């Protein structure tokens, strides 16, 4: 049975690498629209960008693209920034070198140390591309070099939980009343889903179709339903490895119950029911990721003696 220290570290490596990648993707699209779309109010738009990442009560002097870059891209002390998330992933990897290949460690080092410490708006796209490319490389090496054992499962669960959380935050900040093609395309692009959506929904881009695709599609690897299904499968495997898949009443362990309820809530409801109180639904999805994380901590990372 795996040491809880390794399980915990692998889980957070998965989360932090995914966070760096998703933050770079969302900011790349959002900040480009602010700098290139003249009608947009940069102050309100920057406040909206902060809101995606849960940053509220932002001082007026921070409502500029430059300050967004400083706080959400290059601040290594902030684990929610691109550089900070990579730094946190590297620190977790340092403690479990025995569970990672040399290639993964070197790639994560390169990603962390190579992130620029200062990014100007005129050069931000290069920084975002660097982060996305390096995260893709780290994930590719993890996928190609890791045995599908417990370490892999914890890494995978962390990655997928972060993906669901970031998707929910992004969708929560989206104005559903803006049904323009431009706004919907920006949403899909920020979720790396535009091309996949076009291949699946031939014809005009519609906001209802985009929400449906991002939440409910069963084969798109960035949809909420797909990620939750994969998390459930991984948690089932982990439970079996630890001999506690179900108790005598047929009840799954707490993390699986939380995921199962969330998945059923998506699968067995009409889209109109979900979008009726959309902000609250996305808030609930974020609470699910937090509850599963706490459950994993209690069950695997910091179990009671």
Residue ranges and their predicted role:
Residues 1-305:
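Alpha-helical transmembrane segments and their helix-helix packing motifs
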């Amino acid at each position: 049975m795996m040491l809880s220290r390794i399980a915990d570290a692998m889980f957070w490596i998965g989360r932090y690498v995914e966070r760096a990648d998703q933050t770079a993707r969302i900011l790349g699209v959002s900040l480009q629209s602010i700098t290139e779309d003249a009608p947009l109010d940069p102050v309100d738009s920057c406040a909206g960008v902060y809101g995606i990442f849960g940053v509220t009560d932002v001082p007026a002097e921070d409502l500029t693209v430059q300050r967004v870059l400083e706080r959400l891209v290059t601040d290594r002390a902030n684990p929610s920034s691109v550089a900070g998330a990579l730094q946190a992933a590297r620190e977790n990897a340092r403690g479990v070198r025995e569970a990672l290949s040399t290639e993964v460690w070197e790639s994560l080092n390169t990603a962390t140390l190579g992130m620029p410490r200062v990014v100007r708006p005129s050069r931000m796209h290069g920084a975002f591309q660097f982060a996305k490319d390096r995260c893709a490389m780290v994930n590719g090496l993890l996928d190609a070099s890791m045995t599908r054992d417990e370490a892999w499962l914890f890494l995978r669960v962390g990655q997928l939980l972060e993906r669901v959380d970031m998707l929910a935050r992004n969708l929560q900040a989206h104005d559903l009343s803006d049904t323009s093609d431009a706004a919907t395309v920006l949403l899909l692009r920020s979720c790396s889903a535009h091309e996949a959506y076009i291949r699946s929904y031939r014809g005009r881009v519609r906001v209802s179709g985009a929400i449906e695709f991002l939440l409910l599609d069963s084969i798109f690897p960035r949809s909420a339903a797909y990620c939750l299904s994969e998390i459930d499968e991984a948690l089932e495997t982990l439970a079996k490895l630890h001999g506690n898949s179900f108790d005598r009443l047929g009840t799954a362990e707490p993390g699986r119950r939380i995921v199962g309820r969330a998945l059923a809530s998506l699968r067995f409801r009409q889209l109109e029911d979900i979008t009726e109180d959309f902000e609250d639904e996305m808030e609930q999805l974020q609470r699910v990721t937090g509850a599963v994380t706490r459950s994993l901590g209690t069950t695997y990372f910091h179990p009671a003696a």
